[in-house]
Amino acid sequence: MNQTPGSTVPETATPVTSPASSPSAPETTFTPVIITGMSGAGLSTAARVLEDLGWFVTHNLPPQMILPLVEMCAREDSPVDKVAVVCDVRSREFRGGLRETITELEEKNLAPTVLFLDARDDELIRRFDNVRRTHPLQGSQTLQVGIERERQMLSDLKEEADVVIDTSELSVHDLRRAIESSFRTIAKRVQHVTIESFGFKHGSPRDADFIIDARFLPNPFWVPELRPFRGVDKPVSDYVLSQKGAGEFLDNFIAMLDDMLPGYRHEGKNFITVGIGCTGGHHRSVAVSEELARRLGERPDLDVSVVHRDINRN
């Protein structure tokens, strides 16, 4: 993903409802969004996508100015009904100030959805090198030092974020699709399930809540007439899903999700990522992901999307 390091992009957003700070606090469906994360992880892309979806987006607002902005936008007579704030380490008041602002918003029944964008160190270094820019925290030190400083500064915020997106393996188009799907989910007030197929040889998704290994199924790669196809093609899909254990696996996994999703919803976790892997990410994981998405997509309380990360990778 060729993204300017200082920019920012969001990941799937979770509708968060927090209790009123007092019995007289007004109920509201207004949910502000705070976009933050590692420099170079795609914050600007996220901001542009939200703007295209009708959000009012402000960039690099000091944390102490977020509360007045959100309160103004939350008023009944405000022309703005969706507001997102991009906040990164370039703000002098970032350290500690953002966490304090989030607490203040929660106390006023304006709990924000916090989106955190991340990427591997090696990928961040590559992106900075591509645009020949320095990291905002590196000073006279190396780029790696700047990234390490920022990662340490943001560790608590990442842990508490409602949504974390790892953009290391995402193209700009992949990230746009993920963001569009996630933010449309906010209005629906449903749980969003992203099913991501991948190849273990290329590494597992870092942002997955579940990692499922589909390598227990026979590999269509070794069937000459199926090798040129992919898991989205009917011959491969029929072959994979007809294997012993495939149907039982899907039934059991969905039953497990049925037990867990209500608990996730109660805890305010409305974005779940399921990673399904096989060797290369071309056949078994793709076919199983498509079938799982088809079954879950029939449910009105779920918004389901599918990403085939490695399907076109050699």
Curated annotation (Swiss-Prot):
Belongs to the RapZ-like family. GTP binds at residues 88-91. InterPro entries: P-loop_NTPase, RapZ-like, RapZ-like_N, RapZ_C. It comes from Corynebacterium efficiens (strain DSM 44549 / YS-314 / AJ 12310 / JCM 11189 / NBRC 100395). GO terms for molecular function: ATP binding; GTP binding. This is Nucleotide-binding protein CE1710. Residues 1-29 are annotated as: Disordered. Pfam families: PapZ_C, RapZ-like_N. Residues 7-29 have a biased composition (Low complexity). ATP binds at residues 37-44. Keywords: ATP-binding, GTP-binding, Nucleotide-binding. Gene3D superfamilies: P-loop containing nucleotide triphosphate hydrolases. NCBIfam families: PRK05416.1. Displays ATPase and GTPase activities.
